[in-house]
Amino acid sequence: MSTNWRELFPTKLTFVIFLLYMSLFIGQGIFVTASQESNNSYGYNTVTVVLLTEVFKLIVSTCLYCRDNNLRSLVRDVQKDRNVLGLYMVPAFLYCLYNNLAFVNLATFDPTTYYLLLQLRVVVTGILFQIIFKKYLSQRQWISLILLTLGCMMKQVDFGSFYSDANDDSESAAIQQQLQSHNKTTSAETHAHGKNMSGFDFSLSAVFILAQTICSCLAGVYNEYLLKDKGADVNIFVQNVFMYLDSIVCNAVILLLRGELLDAFSPQNLGSIMRFSVLIIIVNNAAIGIVTSFFLKYMNSILKTFASALELLFTAVLCYFLFSIPIYMNTALAIAVVSYAIYLYTQSPVVNLGKVRPLSNLSDATTKSTDKRKLIDEEAAESDLDMV
């Protein structure tokens, strides 16, 4: 099916939203990496940063709600739907783990490898939908998921090793000598600045990236399975308030368990956060949640697919110029295969509509601000956020 660009970008505003959506997600990995010390550690408390991000988003959501209502009305809505507030604790906890693991994994992997490996969430989500919702995958869907997995695995392939069986003549000997020199350089650059740039290496870092992926998928599926009907009639900004309140509690509990709850807000620790390189992370991650809601309101899933593919490409290019992270053949091929797999998957994505009428076209998303489908899409999109 051909793509009508006028239909994808009906106004200049939609194109601006698309650029913002893509730029914010690219900036997420770039800003976190740029805020690291020379040994890839953080000179600030990352859990506190995640907590302050949730506080900032709570303030923004409250202000957006109060444009047409007042604080008293918000309190009434929270009391009326307090059972939904309790239900949000599960996805809030999962996203809390996801957001904190993002800092851990970006200290281990370079941003390009990190985003490539996170695409495995499409595979996990597809399998979970088949198990929980009995939404059996078609042949095309299975092919796309297999391609996506192979694309992520391709990041670890050393194409220089394919020349190891060459004949031992003068020409091949020269090639082997060059390859040995190249492999030494590659080995050093693969862990440049202490970063893992080869993908999975069957270590604790692989467990952490898998845990982050699974947390994202489980949180998204939980929202579909439990909150689709019970939360569909709740104002979207009230739903955001529920999520951010529960997220603040979860992050506070993590600080408490680590014995850092009081010390995290000491003048010294807050001073380490009140730097441009850290504050921009908080603002960027808060903006992601806001722009995503506009993205889903004015655009469709095809653009979301294009955005995911372009994020991988531009992240690799920016990391090359900003952090001198090389782009090898395996990285380029992995990005190409994963991007195509995502595109193929979205031609017939696995969805669970429940009791909600699906949108027939793009204009339906903007006709009614209370359209239930929009609420559900915004809720499900939380699983695609890198640090929400």
Curated annotation (Swiss-Prot):
Secretion signal span: none
Membrane spanning stretches: 13-33, 46-66, 84-104, 113-133, 142-162, 202-222, 236-256, 276-296, 309-329, 331-351
A biological process from GO: positive regulation of protein glycosylation
GO molecular function annotation: UDP-galactose transmembrane transporter activity
GO cellular component: Golgi apparatus; Golgi medial cisterna; Golgi membrane
Membrane topology: Multi-pass membrane protein
Disruption phenotype: Lethal in late larvae and early pupal stages. In immunologically unchallenged third-instar larvae, displays abnormalities of the immune organs, including melanotic cells in the hemocoel and melanotic tumors in the lymph glands; in the primary and secondary lobes, shows activation of lamellocytes and reduced numbers of hematocyte progenitor cells and plasmatocytes. In addition, displays hyperactivation of immune signal transduction via the Toll, JAK/STAT and JNK pathways; shows reduced expression of galactose-containing glycans affecting also spz glycosylation.
Keywords in alphabetical order: Golgi apparatus, Membrane, Sugar transport, Transmembrane, Transmembrane helix, Transport
Subcellular locations according to the entry: Golgi apparatus membrane
Other comments on record: The gene name means 'Buddha with a thousand hands manipulating tools to protect us' in Japanese.
Stated role: UDP-galactose transporter involved in the synthesis of galactose-containing glycans. Plays a role in quiescence of the innate immune response, possibly by regulating glycosylation of the Toll pathway ligand spz.
Protein family membership: Belongs to the nucleotide-sugar transporter family.
Protein's UniProt name: UDP-galactose transporter senju
Organism in which the protein naturally occurs: Drosophila melanogaster (Fruit fly)
